[in-house]
UniProtKB/Swiss-Prot annotation:
Membrane-related topology note: Multi-pass membrane protein
Lumenal topology ranges: 56, 104-105
Protein origin, superkingdom: Eukaryota
Complex and partners: Oligomer.
Free-text note on domains in this protein's UniProt record: The short lumenal loops between transmembrane domains 1 and 2 and between transmembrane domains 3 and 4 may impart a wedge-like configuration, thus deforming membranes.
Name this polypeptide is given: Protein yop1
Amino acid sequence: MASFQDRAQHTIAQLDKELSKYPVLNNLERQTSVPKVYVILGLVGIYTFLVFFNIAGEFLVNFAGFLIPGYYSLNALFTSGKADDTQWLTYWVVYALLTVVESAINAAYWFPFYYIFKFVLILWMSLPQTNGAQVVFHSFLQPVLGRFFTSGSTSANLRAQADAASKSQ
């Protein structure tokens, strides 16, 4: 069984390999002589520290909640597949719900470490490796709210029924 240090070195090597795909990080490493992995891990550590102690936590979490999902949402607009549309529409519905609820009840005051919870939830829902928004959609939104949005629902196709009735006359 590999020791903790061996696993950490392996993970750092994998992360370094992944980060080597980005020329900006390679240039930064050459100019500063600081390994890009340590720069990224340091920035992630500072970011997490600030969110944990709610030093600009709301801004930092909302920034993270917009940056990555915003990119992937724009990407989804230019593809023809439906799966990514469901992923990102669900993400934005849950994100909007969290934002409205947090402002309505002053969540950061009533729930300690609220921004850590929101940050972890946002990452889980938005990262392509986890597709958590799909889980939220299939586990909660579709079973609970799906009956209000089915094609047979009066509210969902009332306009179509009215148009069909007016054309038949």
